[in-house]
Design a protein with these regions (language model features):
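Acidic, small-polar-rich N-terminal luminal/periplasmic segments of exported/outer-membrane proteins
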Residues: 23-156, 269, 431, 435-437
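Outer-membrane beta-barrel signature, preferentially recognizing the C-terminal barrel domain
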Residues: 252-279, 304, 348, 396-411, ...
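Repeated loop/turn-to-beta-strand initiation elements of outer-membrane beta-barrel proteins
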Residues: 186-189, 229-235, 279-284, 321-325, ...
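Transmembrane beta-strands of outer-membrane beta-barrel pores
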Residues: 165-169, 195-199, 239-243, 290-294, ...
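Flexible loop and strand-edge segments within Gram-negative outer membrane beta-barrel domains
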Residues: 198-206, 210-216, 226, 230-284, ...
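Outer-membrane beta-barrel translocator/receptor signature
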Residues: 103, 118-120, 126, 131-204, ...
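Residue-level signature of outer-membrane beta-barrel architecture
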Residues: 181-182, 225-226, 276-278, 315-319, ...
Length: 461
C-alpha cells in the first residue's frame, strides 16, 4: 500500500499571542505531581508526542512503524489489530488513560482505535511482565496516555486552538480541530474533533483495493486540574464512529465480484483519573472507567453490543532504594448479540478482580531487581435469550465458571555501560475465560439441552 501526504495545513490560535517566544519559555515545565519512576526492563518501548508528530502519524500503523516488537494489521480503522511479537490484541492488556480496552465485537475487526493527535505517551511491554500490567497480559501490555489542555498551552497562554487539514494522494482527506484553555489557574479544558474520509486506496501496482473506503468521526472532551496542591483529577469523554461498506470479513482482501455490506462501529468511553501525592509513603492513583461499543453489519446484518466498566486503585511507597506498588483492580464485561433488527438472542458476562504487588530495588547503583506477584479471580456466565417455537424462553438459567490464578515475576537489570544493559527475567500471566466474540456467541452456547454449555475443564491460560 502506498501512502503519501501531499499537503497538510495547520493553523493555531493562542492568547496571549507570542510569536517571538523563546525556546526556553516554550519548554517551561508546568505544575505537575506526576512522578516518573525508572522500572528497569518493564517498559521495552516508550513513544512520546514528539515522536508521533515527527512520524506524521495518521493511524496506529504509523505510530508503531518503527517499533520492531509491535505491528498493526488491517487496511481500515475498524479492521486494525495490534500485534506484539505475533500475538494479537486479544492477548494483550491495552489501556487508554488506565481504561482497559477489552472484548471482541467481531473477530474480523480490531478492538483498539485511537487518534494519534490525542496521544501524549505510549508505553509498550512485550511479553508477560509486571504484576501492575493488569489481568490477561499474556502477550504484553500497551498503555496509551492522552493529552490535556496543560500539555498544549505554553508559558502564559490562557487559551489556544488548532485546525489541521490533510490530503492523502491515496484517496483520502482528514480534518481536525481543537480548542483548549484554562478555566482557572489550576484547571484546563480540551475539546477535539476530527473527521476522516477515505475512498478505496490503490496498491503498489495501481489496483483499487475494494472495501477500504470508510468515514471516521471522533469527538473528545477532557477537563483536568488540581483540586488541591497535591491532588490531581481528570475526567474525559470520547465518542467514535466509523461507517463504510466492508466485506464479510473486513480484515481480509476482497475478491473481485465479492459483495460489500454496510457496516458501522461505535464506541463511547468515559474515564476519571485521580492522583494524591501525600508523601514518600503515599502516592495514590485511582482510575474508574466505562466503555460501550457496538458493531452492526456484515453478511447477516448482526448487532453486537459490549459494555465494560472497572477501576484500578494503587499506591506507591518509596523507601530508600526500594519502590513498592500495590493495589486492586476490577473489570466487568457484558456482551449481547442478535440480528440487527429483532430481539437480543445471546448474552455473556465476565469479570476479573486482581490484587497485585510489584517492587523495584536498587541493589547497587548498577543493579536493579524487580519482583512481584498477582492474584486474579475470574467469573464467567453465559445465557441464551431466544424463545422456542411456542414463544417460551429456551432457558433462563445461566451456566458459568469461577476460577483463580496466581502469577509471579522476577527480573534483573545490570547497567554495563551508558550504552549497554544486561537484562534477565521470568514472568507469568494468566487469562481466564472471558466473554466471547459477539458474532459467534450463538455457535457454541447451546447443544439442545435445557441449559447453556460451558466445558467443565476450561482453565485459565
Amino acid at each position: 500500500m502506498k501512502k503519501l501526504v501531499l499537503a497538510s495545513a495547520v493553523c493555531t490560535l493562542s492568547s496571549p499571542v507570542v510569536f517571538a517566544q523563546s525556546l526556553e519559555n516554550q519548554n517551561e515545565e508546568t505544575k505537575s505531581i506526576e512522578r516518573v519512576a525508572v522500572v528497569g526492563a518493564a517498559t521495552n518501548l516508550s513513544i512520546t508526542a514528539e515522536d508521533i508528530e515527527q512520524f506524521q502519524a495518521n493511524d496506529l500503523a504509523d505510530v508503531f512503524r518503527e517499533s520492531p516488537s509491535v505491528s498493526v494489521g488491517g487496511s481500515v480503522g475498524v479492521a486494525q489489530k495490534i500485534f506484539i511479537r505475533g500475538l494479537e490484541d486479544a492477548y494483550l492488556n491495552v489501556t487508554v488513560d488506565g481504561a482497559q480496552q477489552t472484548s471482541t465485537l467481531f473477530h474480523h475487526i480490531g478492538r483498539v482505535t485511537l487518534d494519534p493527535d490525542l496521544l501524549k505517551q505510549i508505553d509498550v511491554q512485550a511479553g508477560a511482565g509486571e504484576a501492575t500490567s493488569g489481568p490477561g497480559a499474556i502477550g504484553g501490555s500497551i498503555r496509551f496516555k492522552t493529552k490535556d489542555a496543560q500539555d498544549l498551552l505554553r508559558g502564559d497562554e490562557q487559551f489556544g486552538g488548532r485546525v489541521k487539514a490533510s490530503y492523502f494522494s491515496n484517496e483520502g482527506t482528514r480534518y481536525s480541530g481543537s480548542l483548549y484553555g484554562k478555566l482557572s489557574d489550576s484547571w484546563g479544558l480540551l475539546g477535539y474533533y476530527s473527521t476522516v474520509d477515505r475512498d478505496n486506496f490503490e496498491d503498489g501496482d495501481g489496483n483499487e483495493v475494494l472495501g477500504t473506503a470508510a468515514d471516521q468521526d471522533l469527538m473528545f472532551l477532557k477537563a483536568s486540574g488540581y483540586i488541591a496542591d497535591n491532588q490531581y483529577l481528570s475526567i474525559s469523554a470520547e465518542q467514535r464512529d466509523e461507517e463504510g461498506e466492508f466485506s464479510a470479513r473486513p480484515n481480509w482482501v476482497v475478491l473481485e465480484g465479492a459483495p460489500l455490506y454496510p457496516s458501522e462501529a461505535e464506541r463511547d468511553t468515559y474515564v476519571a483519573n485521580y492522583r494524591f501525592d501525600h508523601s514518600a509513603l503515599v502516592f495514590l492513583e485511582a482510575t474508574a472507567y466505562q466503555t460501550s461499543s457496538s458493531f452492526r453489519g456484515g453478511r447477516f446484518d448482526f448487532l453486537s453490543d459490549i459494555d465494560t466498566y472497572g477501576f484500578d486503585i494503587r499506591n506507591t511507597t518509596d523507601i530508600s532504594n526500594h519502590v513498592f506498588t500495590y493495589g486492586i483492580d476490577y473489570r466487568k464485561d457484558e456482551v449481547e448479540s442478535g440480528p440487527g433488527v429483532g430481539p437480543v438472542q445471546n448474552a455473556e458476562k465476565g469479570s476479573v478482580m486482581g490484587i497485585y504487588a510489584q517492587a523495584h530495588s536498587n541493589i547497587t547503583p548498577e543493579l536493579l531487581l524487580s519482583y512481584g506477584v498477582r492474584y486474579d479471580d475470574f467469573d464467567f456466565q453465559q445465557q441464551i435469550l431466544i424463545d422456542d417455537y411456542y414463544g417460551t424462553p429456551v432457558t433462563d438459567e445461566p451456566s458459568g465458571l469461577d476460577d483463580n490464578e496466581l502469577s509471579f515475576n522476577v527480573g534483573l537489570e545490570y547497567q554495563l555501560t551508558e550504552a549497554w544493559t544486561l537484562g534477565l527475567g521470568y514472568a507469568e500471566a494468566a487469562r481466564g475465560k472471558q466473554i466471547g466474540d459477539g458474532f459467534t456467541l450463538d455457535e457454541y452456547l447451546y447443544d439442545g439441552e435445557d441449559v447453556p454449555v460451558v466445558a467443565s475443564d476450561v482453565v485459565p491460560e
